[in-house]
């Protein structure tokens, strides 16, 4: 289980350093390493086999919005805001587009990108950018509740399920179905699946091994 959050209560992730990027230097690609660090970060979060939860304790701007979209779940404090203000300084959130496109409806996404106006917590919940909104005092309690609920489930089922969901995102529906059919026997043959079946039949709590 991985919970991503910011230090303190002001920001989850404030985005890039505008002063440091004033000359455009940070945005120049290294010919020997053309992948942008933000893109690698989002991909790593999405591909992570452990469940990821964004604990949004304050403003999440630019890359912060991308991190939230790359996570599996998100819990947001009601005072927080999520935005992509790059257009206000003559930029566009190029590397943030891919993870956000997978979560937000296109029209709301474009509104955020071309106006630079951030979403309130209420709006983020409405558009499924986050799972839950709480007051600041209840943020840790809600995150802990989710962590406990996930921790009670089979680690191997979650691990294989996350792999499947991530792999199927760019497939056609028939491809998704064929891929799912190949994975179903694999998950059913794990130690956790056998333990889960036996625990259900004998009416006891399963003891997961994660294998």
Where are these regions (language model features)?
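A general secondary-structure junction signal
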Residues: 6-8, 162-165
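Crotonase-fold acyl-CoA enzyme core
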Residues: 43-156, 189-190, 194-198, 204
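Glycine- (often His-adjacent) and acidic-residue-rich active-site loop
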Residues: 6-44, 60, 172
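Helix-loop "lid/cap" segments that line or gate small-molecule binding pockets
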Residues: 112-113, 164-168, 182-188
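Hydrophobic alpha-helical core bundles mediating ligand binding, dimerization, or RNAP-core interactions
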Residues: 38-42, 146-147, 165, 180, ...
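Short C-terminal tail/terminal secondary-structure segment
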Residues: 205-211
């Amino acid at each position: 289980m991985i919970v991503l959050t910011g230090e303190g209560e002001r920001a989850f992730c404030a985005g890039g350093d505008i002063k440091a990027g004033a000359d455009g230097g940070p945005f120049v690609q290294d010919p020997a390493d053309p992948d942008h660090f933000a893109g690698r970060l989002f991909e790593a979060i999405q591909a992570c086999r452990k469940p990821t939860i964004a604990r949004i304790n304050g403003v999440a701007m630019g890359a912060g919005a991308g991190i939230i979209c790359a996570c599996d779940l998100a819990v947001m404090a009601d005072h927080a805001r999520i935005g992509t203000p790059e257009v206000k300084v003559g930029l566009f959130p190029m590397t943030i587009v891919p993870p956000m496109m997978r979560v937000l409806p296109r029209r709301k996404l474009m509104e955020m990108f071309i106006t630079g106006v951030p979403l309130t917590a209420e709006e983020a919940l409405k558009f499924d950018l986050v799972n839950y909104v709480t007051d600041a005092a209840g943020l840790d309690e809600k995150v802990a509740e989710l962590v406990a609920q996930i921790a009670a489930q089979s680690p191997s089922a979650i691990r294989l399920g996350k792999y499947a969901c991530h792999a199927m995102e760019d497939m056609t529906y028939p491809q998704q179905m064929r891929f799912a059919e190949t994975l179903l026997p694999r998950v059913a043959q794990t130690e956790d699946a056998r333990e889960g079946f036996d625990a259900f039949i004998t009416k006891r709590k399963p003891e997961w091994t994660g294998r």
